From Swiss-Prot:
Highest classification ranks of the organism: Bacteria, Bacillati, Actinomycetota, Actinomycetes, Mycobacteriales
Residues of the Guanylate cyclase domain: 297-408
Protein name: Bifunctional lipase/adenylate cyclase LipJ
CDD domains: CHD (cd07302)
Coiled coil: none
Amino acid sequence: MAQAPHIHRTRYAKCGDMDIAYQVLGDGPTDLLVLPGPFVPIDSIDDEPSLYRFHRRLASFSRVIRLDHRGVGLSSRLAAITTLGPKFWAQDAIAVMDAVGCEQATIFAPSFHAMNGLVLAADYPERVRSLIVVNGSARPLWAPDYPVGAQVRRADPFLTVALEPDAVERGFDVLSIVAPTVAGDDVFRAWWDLAGNRAGPPSIARAVSKVIAEADVRDVLGHIEAPTLILHRVGSTYIPVGHGRYLAEHIAGSRLVELPGTDTLYWVGDTGPMLDEIEEFITGVRGGADAERMLATIMFTDIVGSTQHAAALGDDRWRDLLDNHDTIVCHEIQRFGGREVNTAGDGFVATFTSPSAAIACADDIVDAVAALGIEVRIGIHAGEVEVRDASHGTDVAGVAVHIGARVCALAGPSEVLVSSTVRDIVAGSRHRFAERGEQELKGVPGRWRLCVLMRDDATRTR
């Protein structure tokens, strides 16, 4: 495998006269719209390992949609500050959802940009499946009826000196406040500075920070109907946990989970408990340490031209053909010691302990189903997977599974296509392969070398 830098294609959605930059990764059954972090544009996310891993975990169970809101990063700059703020940033999010064909999404709303998510859930209830607020607030500053907010005199340095390039030299280190566990990491600090520069010049940072500091969206909380998960680190001093408790008290049916930690930046520190809560909230299944991990060879099969076959045969004859296909494939999987873990449309997903067994099984399946007048495409990859139901082995998940599915999608009729990982493991065996070259796999970082099984020269096991 030739691994390239982690690059996701940036596209643009139109929001009035604004161009809103966005990226998509993963292809899970649920859309997860990740609102921007604090002055971290989307083209900087994958350059920071902890943030990259956090988003990859999200993409293992959802389709992640992330964006730069207007005024920041790759999105359009503004002529006037009057078009900044939670209401306008919510419009940016809707424009991106429309551009990617997302009718409804779970909204991931971190820190002070949580206010955008709160407005989005209240103003566009039909577009919000659920809401996740992380270290967020409905208002940053103190008010007589909001004592958990920061006093203006304490907030002022964050709106002035903190936004200047020489802030640390002038004695104000914002990173030590928002992410104390990585404040001493020179590599992280260099990335943080570069991300801030990419986000925009100090004038943009001052304008955005001023709008956020003056925002107050408490009036929308009573209108939020979507299921809401509120996650807040109890040791955060930048956005104290009192903000999260206020949200929980004022959003009907919401659930507050107080997590250990001092970092306001959601992707640093101990992220395991946070990610487990998010995955369980979205999927109903808690991943992480509660899921059994194992090394496996994953095989995907798919009937070529199934829609055309179904139209030509009619429902009854097509159903009979599918039954015969399923019987044949199940028999071959069992014969080679595999385990069926899921069905995928008109195909199967199976795991094997041996890559050679998976290849031999795939080889036989191609020939066996040909007697039915159909062809299949098969993709095989090997890697670590999560067993979702460890006691029964009923399903598997993880990046390796996504790779297997993508390899299968690139296979031609009656082809067995494998990743170079599989080819390298079985080097020296009777199986021979032809190079297919490096390919991009949708939702998977880097470029992957693929190989096709040379079936005509293979030694058959029958």
